[in-house]
Amino acid sequence: MAAAAFPFCAAQEVTRSAQIPGLRPYKVDLEYMPRAEKDSVRMVAELWRGYVESFTSSSVDEARRRSFWVDGSPDYLQEFDDGNLLYASFRENRILDIRKLGGGTYELIAATFSKLPGEEYDNWVEAVLRVCVKAVASGNGGKNNPFRLCNWLDAEFPSLTKTIFKGIEYYCVPGCGVPKKAASGLATFVTRFINEYAPEFQGPLRYVVAPSVDQCERLSGILFNAYSNPLMSSASGKNSDRMFYGRTFGTDIVLSNYWDDRHDVALLLIKSSWPKALPMIQEGIAAYHGGYMDLSYSDIKASLRRYLASKKDLDLSNDDNFYDLSIPVSGKDGVTVAVVPLEGIIGAAIVEYTIVQQGRSKVKNLLGCQNYSDIFKVLGIPSADINDFIRGIL
C-alpha cells in the first residue's frame, strides 16, 4: 500500500500484539498502550460492532442506524453494495485492525468471512473494508460513545485537489488534472438533466476522479472484493481494456475513473430527487440519457435486443424472472465491454418508449410507480401483453 496514494499512512501510529477482550484477535498492543488510548480503541471497536449488529436487530430503525455516522451521513459502504457483504446472515464481520491516525481519528479495517457450510468456505475472505472513525462530542453527560463512523472517501477528501467547473466540484488524486473539454460537456449535460428531472437539486455535485479501477476501489474503502460479477462486486465485470469504475455515494458524490461518467451522474441526480422510485426506472433513465461508460444507449439497446432474441422463453411479464440477471454489453465492434444488470436496460427501453410515444412529462409518472405492474398501468398496457410489449419496443 503506497504512502503516496494514501496520505494518512505516513501519520499512522501502528501498534501491535494482544487481543482486545471479547472481540476477535487483531493486533493492537493493550499492554503498553496508555489507558486513554486503550479506552479509545475499545470504543471504536464497540461502535463498529454495534453498527454491524444493528442490521440483524428488529429494534433498530434507520434513524438509529444513521446515528452511528458523523452528522448522520449516509453509510457509503451500505450504499456501495446494498449491505450484502457486511450484514448478510451467511457472512461474519470481523475487525482486523485499528490504527490511530492522529487527534481523535482512527482507521478501522474489517473483513467479511463466509459462514457457508463446507471446508471450501473455511476462513474464506470475501471482502476487506476500511472506514474512518472520528471523535465527536459524546453527549448524554459523557455516557454515549464519543466516536462516529465515516466512509474512507470522507477521510481522503482533504488530500484531493479540488477544481470547480460550472457547478461541478471535481476532486482529483495527485497528478490527475481535469480535461476542459470533458468537464464542459458534462456540465452542459448536468444542467439539462437537472432542469428536466431534478430542479430541486441544490448541489454542489461532487465528482471524485482517480485514474484506475484499483484506486477508485481503495478510495471507496474497499481493499479487497472476491467477486467479479456486477451484482456483488465493486466494479462491473468486463473483458476488454476499457476498465471502468463508477459509483454513486449518498446524494451528491460520484466516484469514477471516467471524467464524464454521465450514467452515474444521472443516476445520482435521480436518486437524490426521486429516492423512492423503482430502481428499474432510476437505472433506466440513467442508461437512456447517459449510456454506460463509453457506450451509447443505442449500443446498450442493441445488446438487449440480441440477448432477448436468444432467450425467447424468458417471460418478461414478471420482474422476478429477470431482476437478478445480467447480460454482456458490447459496442459496434462487437467486443464485450461490460456485464450489466438486465433490469436497468429494460427500464431504459421503457423510458425511451414513454418519451417518444407519450411525452417527457409521462416519465415522471413512471418515477412514482411503486412496483413493476404499476409501470404498465401508467402506460396503459394490459398485464397479459407485458412480455410482447417489451420485446416489441426493441
Predicted regions span which residues?
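Boundary at the C-terminal end of the N-terminal hydrophobic targeting segment
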Residues: A5-A11, D333
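N-terminal low-structure segments adjacent to metalloprotease catalytic domains
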Residues: C9-T161
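Solvent-exposed, acidic/flexible segments
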Residues: E37-A45, G175, P179-A187, V254-H263, ...
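Coil residues (strongly favoring Ser/Thr
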Residues: S40, E62, V265, D333-G334
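Surface-exposed helix-capping loop/turn segments at secondary-structure junctions
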Residues: S58-E62, E196-G203, G359-V363
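Juxtacatalytic substrate-recognition/specificity segment
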Residues: L160-L278, L295
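Acidic/His/Gly-enriched intrinsically disordered linker/tail segments
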Residues: P275-L394
